[in-house]
Amino acid sequence: MDRNRALAVIPARYASTRFPGKPLAPIAGRPMVAHVVERALEAGCFAAVLVATDDERIARAAADAGARPVITGECRSGSDRVAAAIRDLDADTVVNVQGDEPAVPPQNLRLLAEFLRAHPDAPMATLALPGSPADLDNPNIVKVVCDLAGRALYFSRAAIPYPRNPAPGLVRRHVGLYGFQKAALLAFASWEETDLERAEGLEQLRALAHGMALHVLDAAADSVAVDVPADVPRAEAALAALASRGGSAS
């Protein structure tokens, strides 16, 4: 088996509490999921791009965009849905691509895929960007603190680290992309949800609670998530900016 076989999987469920049918929402004239598929294809490092979904309409849109759709059942989190999609597939590494970021930078996807390829003993990786003091008190911005080797100690919606003696560079903002070795992803999906995961509403805390090393890399670029319909204009602006830098937003 090719040691470098990497898959990109986009979890895309229909029933979003704040934005039902979000993966099919028109962004610059196309379904949002089509843009995410296009970004993953542009990364150029995946043997295949899959969309894991519970809805046939999303599956059709994914196929039209060039992805392989996989119908999954009810899942606890995006990573659990990704695990269900790849369980029986030939893969070494898997990148969970957020389905609500139509302008996700392809270089961020390459960062994760290349790190896992170069470090087969690293079970899981994610990304972060420098944060600001204002981010600390915003519960919609997830913060991460790491050890000296760049592995996550904790993620929280609360202020971490608490700024009693603030220092430059301590505030880091999590970028919600995840890469896994396949075996690590299947182990993650086999574990029960933990109290920390439920308390914060953050699936990655399941990995930390079970002692899995989660490497945090510096993201190459920021992205824009679509959480509610009001976020669509920002996403369209991000797509236009991506196109102006030489990416495709068609």
Can you describe what each PLM-predicted range is?
Residues 53-54, 104, 180, 227:
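A conserved hydrophobic position in a structured secondary element of the catalytic/binding core
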Residues 2-52:
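N-terminal glycine-rich phosphate-binding loop and ensuing alpha1 helix
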Residues 46, 91, 119-122, 212:
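Short, high-confidence coil segments that cap the C-terminus of an alpha-helix
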Residues 50, 56-114:
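Short phosphate-binding loop-to-helix
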Residues 104-194:
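Conserved core of the sugar-phosphate nucleotidyltransferase
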